[in-house]
């Protein structure tokens, strides 16, 4: 399986999230479950069931993030002017007006940046854009067989 490429900042944020979940959040919810259990009949104890559900969701998130980290490495700095993982790229789909250009961060969904949509580097369009530069026209065959063409109008690394 190919490794996920993450920025140093995202990798560190995810490590901190796992640590907080393991050492602070999950133990606090486990205590909440224990206190609710002491209230008696569990079949009608809403606090108990809510705390168990909360624990399950948080534990699932911890496991998901741990899996991402175990299968990730720090992305190298993108080459200047070339679309790579962690590039911010603006594209114009064929037939669209220039004001309809769309801007994306090429990267993992966990890269979350304010105001930027994420495009996976493993998606058909994301992978086709890798290695291209401003002004390049890129034709892509989508998973459903449809063909689209985009023009790279801006690359920021």
Q: What are these language model-derived features?
A:
Residues 18, 22-25, 69-73, 133:
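Conserved NTP-handling cores and scaffolds of large molecular machines
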Residues 59-73:
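Amphipathic alpha-helical coiled-coil segments
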Residues 1-24, 28-63:
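Helix-rich terminal scaffold detector
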């Amino acid at each position: 399986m190919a490794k996920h490429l993450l920025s140093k900042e995202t990798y560190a944020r995810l490590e901190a999230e796992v640590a907080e979940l393991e050492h602070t959040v999950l133990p606090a919810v486990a205590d909440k479950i224990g206190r609710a259990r002491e209230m008696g009949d569990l079949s009608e104890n809403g606090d108990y069931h809510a705390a168990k559900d909360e624990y399950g969701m948080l534990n699932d998130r911890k496991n998901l993030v741990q899996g991402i980290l175990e299968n990730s490495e720090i992305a190298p700095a993108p080459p200047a002017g070339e679309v790579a993982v962690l590039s911010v790229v603006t594209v114009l789909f064929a037939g669209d007006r220039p004001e309809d250009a769309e801007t994306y961060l090429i990267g993992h969904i966990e890269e979350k940046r304010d105001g930027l949509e994420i495009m996976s580097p493993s998606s058909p369009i994301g992978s086709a854009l890798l290695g291209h530069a401003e002004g390049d026209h890129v034709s892509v065959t989508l998973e459903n067989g449809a063909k689209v063409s985009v023009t790279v109008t801006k690359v920021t690394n």
